[in-house]
């Protein structure tokens, strides 16, 4: 082997690219020393990350197991088959495709399989907690299809199933989408099934945010009620960043397989699929149910404590991992609140709230989630303290003494609940 190739292949990251290595160390330090409350984020296990960083990244494997267009796929076939079988077992599904690169890719594949440009779809308004891929005008789903958006009730801030039914009867959509990115309440998938049947629509559940809760049995499953279910594999499922499609009908399964490849993707990411398999295996363990129950309990405690401190919570609470603050109650925008909590090492995101008068770049809300810190071991009492830190910072934005105290409390919490207990905090250079 030449010196050049030996150096290129065998050098570790720190010596091969010290700049990237340093930035990764800094990001790990940030994760260790900040409170992660972004609802769509979580911390993958060492095992998941090791699978994703394996030699599988070298392998091309277009097609499905035992139906590849490349040789040398015997081991990735076994890995992908294991991922499929674990996904089916985890969600009690008849079929699964583990190849989508993301939740958005999974949704696009479903659209390709079931719809034609110009067809009518129904999805929750983005400002009410929906997702870009459910028909937002800035997304391809909003450009290719005729989109009818439903919303939440202005008083309860919950889904009004009768209003949704009337809208569906009026517009006769070909596809109804349920499952959201900022909706903190339990979704009645059976009621959506009834509406879809009444108007002759396909029913898609995008359970990206609640997949882990569904897998653990702490949120009702959409699989028995929906024609197709999509999800990401991170968030509450705590796997690698990727997508997944599930269904219970063999005829649909063939369409979805073709819609993924060759319809919307080329070669699958087998290193990510291996990491998905590991995550599915973790989620099949009894400890994952305990974890998911704690996620929901922690969210309830976070919401209750923030309400007690005079901060409004959309819908008055939560049934899942999401706590959505309506900051109009304290005369603050989401943009300002995001900056204030970030300044004391709490990571969240500004978010629209139902009937928000502000633009999506400003917003009136702050979205919080409990999945990541629950992975670190945070319990109900710890989350009550997190709520107090947030409330102190938002109620006293100009008080530097309170800011310093918030920083100290965050630091103590991070020390009490280390992220990766077997890893040493990297030295920063």
Curated annotation (Swiss-Prot):
The record marks 234 as: Plays an important role in substrate specificity. Keywords: Amino-acid biosynthesis, Cytoplasm, One-carbon metabolism, Pyridoxal phosphate, Transferase. SUPFAM superfamilies: PLP-dependent transferases. GO terms for biological process: glycine biosynthetic process from serine; tetrahydrofolate interconversion. Pfam families: SHMT. PROSITE patterns: SHMT. The keyword Transferase applies. It is found in: Cytoplasm. Homodimer. This is Serine hydroxymethyltransferase. The gene is glyA.
